[in-house]
């Protein structure tokens, strides 16, 4: 049976444990892939996809709880592990890892490294799940990304980061208090 056919709650906890045990050199890449998997699964469960079954307490001890809140907490934890490997991700070109990581719909020059993809994903996550943290964490992430691209030969990635900053600040202004 392939992983696509298996229920995620059956293989995802084991995969997450294997990612945590992987060599340090590939931790950032695998953690980013794990975040993409969790995000994809949570979207499926939230928007009418197949929801995990309830298990007895004994069987559930090895599985993460699949409530929206717990999935968000798990994603937050995975994204923190991704961020801890930011230096490694800055050296990983998106083209080299496109099998594992979805680069999005923009040209690669806008998000040329896995660090750029990770920051984009984190901003999307924080804006969707933790509105009161969007400005604080988002500005820090965007500042890091902009500093990383200030000396690039082209301005595409820097412009993408600046546009993200404007979009996020505009969205933050319109969050009801």
Annotated model-derived regions:
Residues 1-177:
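Extracytoplasmic/secretory-pathway proteins
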């Amino acid at each position: 049976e392939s992983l696509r056919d298996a229920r995620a709650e059956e293989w995802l906890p084991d995969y997450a444990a294997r990612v945590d045990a992987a060599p340090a050199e590939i931790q950032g890449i695998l953690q980013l892939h794990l975040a993409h998997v969790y995000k994809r699964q949570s979207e499926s469960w939230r928007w009418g996809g197949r929801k995990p079954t309830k298990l007895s307490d004994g069987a559930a001890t090895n599985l993460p709880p699949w409530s929206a809140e717990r999935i968000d907490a798990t994603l937050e934890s995975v994204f923190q592990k991704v961020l801890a490997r930011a230096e490694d991700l800055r050296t990983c070109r998106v083209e080299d890892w496109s099998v594992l990581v979805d680069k999005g719909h923009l040209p690669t020059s806008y998000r040329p490294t896995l660090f750029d993809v990770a920051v984009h994903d984190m901003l999307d996550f924080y804006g969707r799940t933790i509105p009161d943290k969007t400005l604080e964490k988002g500005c820090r992430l965007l500042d890091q990304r902009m500093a990383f691209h200030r000396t690039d030969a082209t301005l595409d990635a820097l412009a993408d980061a600046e546009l993200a900053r404007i979009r996020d600040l505009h969205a933050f202004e319109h969050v009801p208090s």
